[in-house]
């Protein structure tokens, strides 16, 4: 049976280890240059950069070749954008401008399969031949919330109550 690839970033964070993730590679060739350097993952920029549904599959495959976990910052907190990004090969998503508890809950709902969320039942290339894929994918997906607005700070206590968020990232906004 095929195993789900390890999310190196999530694994290391769960073990209290430091992770190294460069931001900005724009094509698979550049990602391959990062591969031998030992990074845990690559941050693919889809909000302020050219990463989109057309190139996520190739960029994430380049990460796979070197055992790096691809994280994609998407351009909006919209369920279809989030789950499609995972379906195309991302192991994590970073969601900009999450300001309320309900917005954080929407991220989880779009990122996780039932019973934790409402992500559509599609296995993508990562799930082919993987026993219990949906359960394993729920454990492996990395969800990152970006706090870029003062309203998020004002709502921080409520947002932190939301389960299944892995990283709370304070970003300049």
Where is each model-derived feature located?
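Expand to "…catalyze enediolate/carbanion chemistry for C-C bond making/breaking, isomerization
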Residues: 1-173
